């Protein structure tokens, strides 16, 4: 289903992350997604802000009767923190229980990592043209991870920037 709907190849090895827009019948962008392959049969889809319902509906409308597909909306269970910039790996590594080095965690991949004692799905992607990560954190751990990032980030000149700040770049 996703291979048919996405404008990029998502038949990739588990752990791979792809920017994967879905097109409408006129060739315009219907959905703007990031797709991470978790296993041979499972994917993790990330919609743009406030677009989950729209994107799930688009996917559901294209499931063929012969396709056995389940789509589960887990939006309310996670918060996303973007950590971008040349010091992002150094900062994140101080809190992670796994090696985040370039050779073991290259661009366009994802790992499930313990960060500040919390289970975090980390996507090694960036929307700002710099080294960066998206941290997908269960909501019950979000404040813990945010505070830990800021505690370590003081020495790296970490600053908060709202999601819309990306549009100014």
Q: Language-model segments: which ranges?
A:
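Basic, glycine/lysine-rich polyanion-binding surfaces/domains
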Residues: 1-169
């Amino acid at each position: 289903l996703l291979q048919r709907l996405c404008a990029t190849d998502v038949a990739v090895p588990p752990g791979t992350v792809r920017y994967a827009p879905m097109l409408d019948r006129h060739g315009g962008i219907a959905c703007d997604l990031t797709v991470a392959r978790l296993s041979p049969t499972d994917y993790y889809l990330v919609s743009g802000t406030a677009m989950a319902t729209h994107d799930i509906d688009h996917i559901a409308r294209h499931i063929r009767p012969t396709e056995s597909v389940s789509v589960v909306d887990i939006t309310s269970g996670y918060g996303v923190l973007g950590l971008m910039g040349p010091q992002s790996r150094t900062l994140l590594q101080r809190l992670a229980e796994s090696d985040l080095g370039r050779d073991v965690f290259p661009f366009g991949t994802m790992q499930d990592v313990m960060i500040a004692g919390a289970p975090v799905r980390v996507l090694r992607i960036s929307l700002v043209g710099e080294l960066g990560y998206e941290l997908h954190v269960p909501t019950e751990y979000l404040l813990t991870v945010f505070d830990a990032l800021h505690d370590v980030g003081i020495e790296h000149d970490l600053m908060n920037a709202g999601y819309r700040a990306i549009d100014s770049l």
